[in-house]
């Protein structure tokens, strides 16, 4: 096993903190690069959204790219984002009151309301009762579990589930299975539409300076989605899947770790790895950098 990627938080030339990051790259079911534990068990959290939206995309090919992107989003409740959520609700003949996201600060302003609006539309398309769609016992959630399992090529019974922050089930998989699921996304039915939507509107996933958006802008042809507690999954157009997990859940370590890991695979990352620390005046007071030699491709791993 290669060492985890170590990301240093540097202020005034002093290393103030260090984040350990597990990373794995998978192609055609085989691990091609790793750092740390490639099989650490992780919850997909919001990184599952590009997979969870597949049943809806397959059933409603008339959805536009903005609607698909918002259904994959962990948005910031910007006006343009909420307008698209409302459009999805209208398609579902539903209202904000039907969202089961919880009032934070209102149901439609919840960061996962796009996904939930997509779930309501999926219920309408499938003929499911909308009420209770967030419950693990609901037929929609059973279908989504099957969808995630099929993407990762695992037995659904092997997937541990828990309740996500927005109230719906979330799925635990080994990190390499997360990467495998994303590696297969371009070839799955509806997957190309999801990737095209993410690439067309990366700022809808969260915001214009979020890691997802910066990644899509800087890494040609790739799509990605981050999840809570420091998880990040991405795929190339030719079927390379990558998944990273920060041990302590600090998402700020993702960009430098991801850039360093991808560069070992020969992937150009532009300014992705340039992560700074700013004070309350917006002044740069530090930076995040990976420690040299803390990440190596599998073929060169120190064992």
Regions found by a protein language model. Name each.
Residues 1-39:
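Beta-lactamase-like hydrolase cores
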Residues 14-20, 48, 226-228:
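Short, flexible loop/turn motifs enriched in small residues
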Residues 19-20, 34-51, 66-69:
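Short active-site loop at a secondary-structure junction
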Residues 44-61, 80:
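Active-site SXXK
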Residues 138, 155-203:
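Penicillin-binding protein/beta-lactamase superfamily catalytic region
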Residues 186-303:
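Structured C-terminal helix/loop/strand segments within mature extracytoplasmic catalytic/sensor domains
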Residues 1-2, 66-157, 184:
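Active-site-adjacent helix/loop patches that line small-molecule binding or acyl-intermediate pockets
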Residues 29-39, 66, 157-163:
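Glycine/charged-rich beta-loop-alpha catalytic/anionic-binding loops adjacent to active sites
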């Amino acid at each position: 096993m290669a060492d985890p990627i170590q990301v240093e938080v540097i202020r005034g030339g002093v290393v103030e903190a260090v984040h350990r990051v597990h990373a794995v790259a998978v192609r055609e079911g085989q691990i091609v690069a790793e750092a740390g534990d490639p099989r650490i068990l992780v919850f997909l959290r919001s990184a599952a959204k590009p997979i969870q939206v597949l049943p809806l995309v397959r059933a409603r090919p008339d959805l536009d790219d903005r609607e698909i992107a918002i259904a994959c989003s962990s948005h910031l409740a910007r006006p343009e984002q909420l307008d698209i959520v409302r459009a999805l609700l209208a398609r579902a003949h539903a209202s904000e009151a039907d969202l089961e996201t919880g009032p934070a600060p209102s149901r439609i302003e919840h960061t996962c309301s796009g996904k939930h609006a997509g779930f309501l539309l999926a219920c309408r398309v499938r003929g499911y009762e909308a009420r209770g769609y967030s419950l693990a016992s609901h037929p929609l959630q059973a279908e989504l579990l099957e969808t995630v399992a099929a993407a990762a090529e695992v037995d659904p019974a092997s997937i541990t589930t828990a309740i996500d922050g927005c109230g719906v089930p979330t799925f635990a998989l080994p990190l390499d299975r997360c990467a495998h699921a994303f590696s297969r996304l371009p070839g799955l039915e509806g997957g190309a539409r999801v990737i095209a939507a993410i690439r067309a509107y990366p700022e809808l996933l969260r915001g214009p300076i979020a890691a997802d958006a910066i990644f899509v802008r800087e890494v040609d042809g790739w799509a990605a989605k981050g999840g809570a507690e420091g998880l990040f999954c991405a795929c190339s157009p030719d079927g390379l899947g990558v998944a990273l997990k920060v041990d302590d859940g600090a998402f700020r370590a993702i960009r430098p770790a991801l850039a360093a890991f991808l560069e070992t695979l020969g992937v150009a990352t532009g300014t992705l790895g340039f992560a700074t620390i700013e004070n309350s005046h917006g002044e740069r007071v530090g930076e995040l950098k990976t420690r040299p030699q803390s990440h190596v491709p599998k073929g060169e791993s120190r064992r």
